[in-house]
Amino acid sequence: MRWQFVRYLRYVGSWVAFSLGLSLSQSCLAVDNITILLSEDGPAYTEFSSQLSTVLSQGNSKSTVKVLILSAYKSEDLSRNANNQVLIAVGTPAMTAMAQKPPAMAVLNVLVPRHTFQKIAKQFGRNQDPHHFSAIYFDQPWNRQLGLVRATLPGRNRLGLLLSKDSAEILTGIQLAAKELDIQINVETATDDSELLPALRRLLTNSDSLLALPDAAIYNRNNIPSILLTSYRQKVPLFGFSAAYVKAGALAAVYSSPGQIAQHVAEVIQGLSSNAYLPLPQYPRYFSVNTNTQVSRSLSLEMEDEASLTRKLKSLTERAQ
Amino acid sequence: MHFLALGHILLAEKKHSIPYIHSGIHLSRRAGCVALLFSLLHQAALAGDGEESIFLDDVPVVLSASRLSQPINEAPVAVTIIDRQMIKDSGAWDLSEIFRLVPGMYVAYHADPYFSADSTVAYHGMVTTTTSDRMQVLIDGRSVYASLFGGVNWSDLPIVLDDIERIEVIRGPDSASYGANSYSGVINIITRHPAETQGKTMSMAFGKGRKEGIFRYGGKSGALSYRLTASIREDQGEDDRIKRPTSVFTFWNLNKYDNKTIHNLNLRADYQLNSADTMEFQFGYNGGPREVGEYNNVSAISRRAENHFEMLHWRRALEGGGELSVQAFHTVERVYARLKDSDGISDGDAILRRYDLEVQHTFSPFANARLVWGGSIRYDQTYAPYYLGVGDNQYLYGDFPYHLRRFFGNLEWRARPDLVFNVGGMIENNTYTGTDTTPRFAVNWHVQHGHTLRLSHSRATRSPSVYEKTYDSYWRSAEFYPGLPEMQTERVKSTELGYIGKYGKLDVDFRLFYDDYSQLIDVRNKRSAAGGNLNAGTAIMRGYELQLKAQLTDKTRLIYGLSGGGVKSDNVNGVVYSDSLPKYSHSLMLSHRVNDQWSGSLVAYQVARTKFNSTDYNPRENRGYFIDSNRRLDGKLSYQFKLGGKAAECSVIAQNLADARYFEYRHDNELPGRAVRLNFRLDM
């Protein structure tokens, strides 16, 4: 009861904040100087910056967009003026640089995993002022990830997670989402590479599916063949966290592309007032679902198509917010 | 990874500028080439060192088209899957024994007394030679069907049971996919990927007449994973004396010579070149002394096998789930033998070589369709002077060449979600019989969820072995029947109706089949040659097969197989095909896991009496004889525990628990009595 009440309050709160934001953005001068700081010029980063520029240019705002790359960046490049300014730090290196040497303007971090953002913000004491050092995470909220498991494999509610021993913080919040979706979470920890297969085999004995986590100590290209093959032999499908996983043999994945995050960022920017009071760190608003029908067929799993799974997840996420 | 040095960044403060990045165009061409090559091999990171790279990186395509198995209700053929657990639970000692669990499979222990003391594994009986030459056998796509007599010498295969991931047995002809000799069925053995067999494992077995030691090491180094398995096996085979002989004559009181020592060494290495390409390398060796022969007939004074193979398999995952695969292998099967026969001491050496290259492309030509097509070339060279010395020749020297070219294709079209069509075929050209086409048409209809009907019609062939071809040349020589037409492939037209159903935790697989065999080869019988046709045999085989898999509880699994049917044949020239399919055969396996420590299984087999051809010399039978029905019971009990923190397992396995004495295939081939062995296994 109490939870529901709190959720209701949050719901109301977010609406109030949203409408307030809207009215503010209309009444005050909006942010119109946007600096994008890319960690590097890899395709994902440039996809983000070009998409953001495109979306902003389509909007009514008369913002200027400046794109910098970390390797060539000097703090003099940035304006000393905090008003009407926002810096979008793309990727962990850019975020770390901005956390270490804070610029005058507010920093919105993107393409960063949630636990990395929290770690860096804490490390450099930037977690005190989330409205000036915020993020749109790269990862998906638990209810969306577990919602995909639920929607794809109804009735198979034992979900296995394989973790390295230093990554327990990745799991923050999962139990709550699991409880809401009636999913039972089983966790196994592999301390080193030799422990990987034994831990995985233990996990497979009591799991109906596995969820890959952005834990590079486990989910790296050298381990993925072992994980995918071993789970496939046991007829236990794997859920990934990127489109590449689905191509590799995962059953499905929900993820946000850099372009989708750019869309979200553009909407955030358009909603900002001139003091660039950033919204709290949040998960990406837009996402895609990919499925591997060859794998589902091979495992004789009946599964809805990508479009209807995406629809289901959208309504699920909206309901939860 | 940065291969392109970043130049300075030119970013004007233009309004809404699209980011323009001036990258290192000034890099030298050579550096560019190196970078390109390097990036081709290591398309590692699209993203940099940031922790977000895990969301952006390419991931190696692991479950590519050829690694994914087709669910049995979508396959155009009937398939029995034997997984690792089944192999373990069966308590099988020899690879050939596992096939007793396949409905319709006839297995006779160590039946061949002449070339190698190996088991006969024949789908749907109709065994006219001990080397079950009417079935194709592949290990990781590599054909191990031997050129000399056809069929497979099971103990000569460089493989250890524990390295097998699964076995897919295609029940019925499948020349459309696997070419000639996939005539009555196909056995597809798939070994475990090295990524699944990491670490050190040691296993030892001791039992009556049997000893074995296996050591396996699986390692990984970056994108390379590999496995090395070494084993030594001592097998005393059958008892020397027959306990319940059919005759008082000495000849019928003794089993064949079948002691063997098997040294195995296997290497498999898989290298992930980049996220799309993988290279697999395999090497295998199987060697050691092997006895053959029978008392007062041909037997080996000394005989040793030396076999090895090398295989390279490149796979590239394509967009949209497609795949390109190129596989090349080389096999050498060598026998060094000194034989004793009526002529005194003979040289029984033989060398069988095979070179094979296959290219296969899988892609989706249009929506809801998948096309697999490709081609292969093969060259076999057979040297076996003693065995090819047919008729009065004691030896026929020479390396006999055999060329094979294939072109194949199969289109799988999902016309509706509940309707899958498979249309395919193989065009094949070989040195002996020229060009053949073997088509197949199949439709799988998912009548409702969990219930599928399959109707298929296919044609298949078996090409003559080198031995048969040599006989063909012999009979067609000037001194015999110069007008005798050249020998052709054996043919079969096969029609079947299958049902695959799911009732809760029970899986049902039932099929009715009607196989029309023609041009069946018989060369050893002078009547066939005199009659002007070495391909005179015909037979109609009709029957049914049932397979049940039931997960009775979380801990108990039951697998049952039943098959039955009959063969109608004119038995031309006295070659017996009638009744060569047992009227029925069953197998039942019950396995139960008591707790984390204890588990066990019971396996029962029953085969009805079966008629065989002339290889038996029982004086009371003329051409063709019956082997009585038999029953066999096997059991296994395992205890798993930790030894110094490592997983260990102790098992006791008893084959032929009831100590039944009966014959398989021949009346001088009495199955060993109760054979108990202890197995200890440690994952180090």
Question: What residue ranges belong to the model's regions?
Answer:
Chain B
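Gram-negative outer-membrane beta-barrel transporters
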Residues: 414-421, 513-516, 534-616, 658, ...
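N-terminal periplasmic accessory domains that precede
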Residues: 95-98, 119-125, 137-139, 154-157, ...
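Short acidic/polar hinge/loop motifs at secondary-structure boundaries
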Residues: 142-171
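Conserved C-terminal beta-signal and adjacent last beta-strands/turns
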Residues: 218, 270-272, 455, 579-684
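Membrane-embedded beta-barrel scaffold of Gram-negative outer-membrane proteins
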Residues: 224, 321-337, 382-383, 446, ...
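Structural signature of Gram-negative outer-membrane beta-barrels, strongest in the C-terminal barrel
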Residues: 274, 363-370, 376, 395-516, ...
